[in-house]
């Protein structure tokens, strides 16, 4: 009987130690990012979500912030987002991560949709008022997002080479330029009526 009691106590001790261990280990993954004093607060949140500081994610966030503000939404639950563009694969598809961070719309909540298209458009609809804002990037924003060389291949040893480090630094520099672009350089923001938004969505996806 005493042996059984000791085993029970030991079992519970192991259980609680395991729970404490799991609780202590619960944390988000560490992104590849060194914060700089001039970085806006939203950039740090975007990097935490995306994993590193890249120009396409930064571009998506900037353009989506502008559209969200123009539509008059608070974000997360009071909006629907439609994104159009050539985002089938990275690095361009990283744009979609930036949009999710900036609007709070996510695929889990089913309030964001991507439609393949040649031209980039971010369309935000305010669910409370019906107001729709459509954002299209400027040539300057697109030029910044695309002006980097492909990442060099990883060496057989798996170690980061000096060339890879330079590539990452270039990406981060471009992303920071996008983060600090004047609002008027981001692109055009147009306020649409719901019927106009539906028509434009169909036209631009063709």
Positions of predicted regions on the chain:
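Non-transmembrane, aqueous-exposed alpha-helical and coiled segments at domain scale
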Residues: 24-53, 59-206
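Leucine-biased recognition of intrinsically disordered, low-complexity hydrophobic segments
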Residues: 6, 21-22
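Bacterial N-terminal signal peptides that target proteins for export
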Residues: 2-12
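Bacterial N-terminal signal peptides
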Residues: 10-20
